[in-house]
């Protein structure tokens, strides 16, 4: 074979090889393009994301034709971003979070009713509190129950947790001032993010109050609000068992560093304290002696809602993904790693949950709580409570005046919201 013919054959062979590679690459691109893509927006912390990703990876291994991506967003960014995107006909297929976002999303008509998408027999496996119904429709299916506050205590400093407000104050004084009751020890008996209204709720309920009635009207100008405000101000200014100032981060650091014996914090914090090497206990918040009522927190399931704009070709896979993430083994994995309360009824009665001290006491606290309202008016109430509550702490307003002003401002904000 002459040189020119050899070159010709070589060139033709090379051309076929390149063409084959191009076709193969094009086929891969088409395969990637043709995969069903599902996106989940959430506001969960890093350790929750790690568990979720492991579960998503298992789902994608079972279903290679589907690609699922999780995307973290801060709470306000998620809510406003989802509203804007969904109103424009876009956004993630699934939005995950606490139940209080359901009211605003339903008002905008940007999430789908779920009761006809999932079989009632399948739904019956889960705690009814984890199924968020609003205005006659099911809008969220939760895999985690709680998002609630409890009393967390350092067992080295507090061997036995208090069960009443009087015991809380007594232990707090001993930790803060020592046996003689006068010399500061350099630590506080108790700390928490008490300047925020959400963290005020346990004492409001302990004195017999709540934020709204069944019709969504604020119920802040009450004796319960006044007494709860007085209690918090007293343990700070008279008993001096809590810091003079404390936001969430300050309280968290004080407790982690052993400079506070107890902290009021949510179920999201427990795994972090354990990983930091603290020997912690979790206990129900105390009973108020004068009322005989337990300090109850707002309880909010965290779960899945579906975008109103979900394309028909993705519906099958979105439903399959939610069913997969709700499986007993996946909820158990989350419970073991994160100490979250599962919504699967059989898991709630399982040996692991019943024998784990943290989860057992978490369940008791949940039973003392009330579901967080999902109506949009709740946001107006939070915003109305904050300035007067902080005025009481600053000493510029009496508890009585603050309760009155909270009510007036909440009613005004709700009127403005509904105009």
Regions inferred by a protein language model and the residue ranges of each:
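Extracytoplasmic "Venus flytrap"/periplasmic binding protein-like
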Residues: 58, 62-126, 133, 156-161, ...
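Extracytoplasmic/periplasmic solute-binding protein
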Residues: 139-149, 169-218, 260
């Amino acid at each position: 074979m002459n040189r020119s013919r050899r070159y010709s054959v070589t060139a033709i062979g090379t051309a076929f090889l390149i063409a084959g590679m191009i076709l193969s690459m094009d086929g891969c691109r088409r395969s990637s393009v043709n995969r069903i893509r599902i996106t989940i927006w959430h506001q969960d912390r890093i350790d929750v994301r790690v568990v979720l990703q492991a579960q998503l990876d298992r789902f994608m291994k079972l279903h290679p034709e589907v690609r699922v991506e999780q995307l973290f967003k801060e709470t306000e960014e998620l809510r406003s971003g989802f509203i804007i995107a969904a109103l424009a006909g876009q956004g993630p297929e699934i939005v995950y979070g606490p139940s209080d976002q359901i009211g605003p999303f339903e008002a905008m008509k940007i999430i789908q009713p779920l009761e006809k998408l999932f079989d009632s027999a399948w739904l019956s496996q889960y705690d009814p509190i984890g199924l968020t119904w609003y205005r006659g429709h099911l809008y969220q299916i939760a895999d985690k129950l709680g998002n609630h506050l409890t009393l967390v205590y350092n067992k080295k400093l507090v061997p036995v947790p208090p069960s009443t407000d009087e015991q809380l104050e007594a232990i707090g004084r001993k930790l803060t001032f020592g046996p003689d009751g006068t010399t500061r020890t350099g630590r506080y008996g108790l700390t928490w993010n008490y300047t925020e209204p959400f963290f005020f709720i346990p004492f409001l309920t302990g004195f017999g109050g709540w934020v709204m009635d069944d019709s969504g009207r604020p119920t802040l100008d009450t004796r319960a609000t006044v007494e709860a405000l007085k209690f918090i101000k007293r343990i700070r200014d008279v008993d001096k068992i809590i810091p003079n100032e404390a936001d969430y981060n300050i309280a968290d650091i004080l407790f982690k560093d052993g400079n506070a014996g107890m902290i009021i914090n949510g179920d999201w914090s427990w795994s972090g304290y354990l990983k930091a090497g603290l020997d912690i206990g979790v206990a129900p918040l105390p009973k108020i002696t004068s009322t005989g009522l337990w300090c109850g927190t707002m309880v909010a399931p965290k779960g899945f809602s579906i975008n109103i704009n979900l394309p028909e070709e993705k519906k099958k896979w979105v439903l399959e993904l939610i069913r997969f993430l709700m499986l007993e083994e996946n909820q158990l994995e989350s419970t073991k790693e994160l100490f979250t309360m599962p919504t699967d009824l059989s898991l709630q009665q399982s040996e692991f949950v019943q024998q784990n001290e943290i989860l057992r006491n978490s369940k008791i606290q949940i039973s003392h709580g009330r579901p967080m309202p999902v109506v949009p008016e709740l946001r107006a109430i939070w915003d109305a409570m904050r300035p007067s509550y902080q005025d009481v702490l600053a000493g510029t307003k009496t508890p009585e005046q603050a309760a009155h002003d909270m009510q007036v401002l909440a009613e005004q904000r709700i009127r403005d919201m509904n105009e």
